[in-house]
Structures are given as C-alpha cells and as structure tokens.
Regions:
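Nucleotide 5′-phosphate-binding alpha/beta core
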Residues: 1-107, 113-257, 264-268
Length: 270
C-alpha cells in the first residue's frame, strides 16, 4: 500500500494544487518588509494583554503597558531569577508567567552553569510561532520555486525525544523538536517520515538505524532538522545503500530546512 501511495504521489505534481493553500501566508510575509514596526507593535500589545492577569503580569502592571517605553520598567531577568516560577509551572500551577496551564517544556542544553534550562512552551507559542514559522518557511520556498515537486513525496523530519514532566498529567519535557512532532497536525503525519514512534526514540543510535530502514526506500523530497543530527542519519543511509551520492537514494530531494546550527558542514558532506 505504501509503494502504491509513493507511486501516485510521484506521478502527479500535487504541489501546484497544495501551493495555493500557502498564498495567504505568502501575502502576510510580504508585509514584513513594509509594515514591520506596526506588525511588531500589534504582537507586543497582544502579548501584554494575554499575560496581564498572570502573576507576573499583575506584578509588573502589564495591563497598563501599551508602549515599549513602559515595558522598560520591567527588569531584565536571568533564568536563575525566574527559575522558581518555571518550576511552579512545571508542577502544574496556572497563570504564573503565562495564562492558563503550560504543559510542555523545552529542555535546553547546558550553557553558562552547565545545567539544562526548561523553557515553557505554551499552546499559543506552538501554533503562533513554531508551526506558523514552519508554514512560512515552506510558503516562501514554494513562492521562490514555482516548479517545485515538494509534495510529490514525503519530508524526513528529524527530532529529539521527550519524557513525562514530573507526574503532571499530559505534561512533557524534552527537546523542542520532539514537542513539535508530538503535537503536530495529524495531516502532516501523512506527508512525513518516519512515524512518530521512531521519530521520538530516545536512543540515538537505534533511532538512526530505524530511520534509515524506514526512509531509504521512500520518495523523500525534503529534509528538516538539526544539521549535526541529520548528518549522522544521512551518512548511515549512504553507507547502507552503498553510495556516496544522496541523489541516488532520493532523486527528487530538493530542499533542507535547518532548525538550528550551521548548515555549511552538512552541505559539504552530502
């Protein structure tokens, strides 16, 4: 059944049809160059309004902040200073730094204190920033590449892993990419590989092996992920397929979306 689906997708250029769904985002992003300040002010006011009745917003009078100059009365905080608030949120408290209950926390790598930091990821943040940003990236790519066959195959989306957050129901902590994969629109799962179970494996060596087996015979047209992680996967796929040319594995591959890190080393490798 999977082979039949792949053949159908490959034969028909569904990208031209699907691209029309991205037109509104293309028009919206076109305004960034000419209305950047007004758009930023609109977002600023919305953030102040949405956080006004949180503990933090009440403490610093977010309700009365309409201009950036007034925001300057809110002191700049280090992570260590807001960590107690974050910990309370991780234990399920509502309306602390953001309205309602935040269920997901992105775990950063150790930095200055060589300790991980836990960044609250709200539902609004997921949809209005992360998913919207992904949509915009695809929209701009399709706009600049009208002959693309992006949707004639599938996207290899590489992410990290997550784990339960304390014992709070439905709350997760882990790599941001894993949180995005966990909550992605089910329709996206129809055009991405590997499946969620493999994508969220915590053992990286096992993940690389299973991703290789699950994707090397698929028609992959696009890649998304951290360059260093993607490099490990692609190297293993090339090794298993017995080639040094990625085009022999996925002849229709056309674009790589980098989540973070330097793409240069990956581009030289593949």
């Amino acid at each position: 059944m999977q082979d039949i689906t792949n053949r159908i997708l490959r034969q028909m250029n569904s990208t031209r049809l699907i691209s029309t769904l991205f037109k509104p985002r293309q028009k919206a992003t076109a305004l960034y160059a000419t209305q950047a300040e007004a758009l930023q002010h609109k977002v600023f006011c919305r953030l102040m309004k949405d956080a006004a009745h949180t503990e933090w917003g009440l403490k610093y009078g977010y309700k009365d902040i309409k201009r950036y100059q007034r925001l300057q009365r809110v002191p700049i905080q280090t992570y260590e200073e807001i960590k107690p608030y974050v910990e309370r949120m991780r234990h399920g408290e509502k309306d602390v730094l953001w309205r309602g209950e935040v269920q997901w926390f992105a775990k950063s790598s150790g930095t200055t204190n060589d300790k991980s930091k836990f960044i609250p990821v709200s539902r609004e943040g997921l949809h209005d920033i992360h998913y919207a940003g992904g949509m915009d990236a695809v929209a701009l790519y399709l706009q600049q590449n009208p002959e693309s066959r992006f949707f004639s195959g599938k996207g290899l989306i590489l992410g990290g892993s997550h784990a339960p957050n304390y014992n709070v129901k439905r709350s997760l902590v882990g790599d941001l990419s894993a949180i995005l994969i966990e909550n992605v629109n089910p329709l996206v799962n129809l055009i991405r590989v590997p499946d969620k179970k493999i994508a969220l494996l915590s053992d990286f060596e096992e993940k690389v092996e299973r991703i290789t087996r699950a994707t090397m015979n698929q028609n992959v047209t696009n890649l998304s992920g951290v360059p260093s992680w993607m490099m490990a996967v692609l190297k293993h796929i090339l090794e298993v397929k017995g080639t040094d040319n990625l085009a022999e594995v996925w002849p229709d591959l056309e674009v790589f979306f980098s989540w973070r890190g330097c793409f240069y080393s990956l581009s030289r490798t593949i």
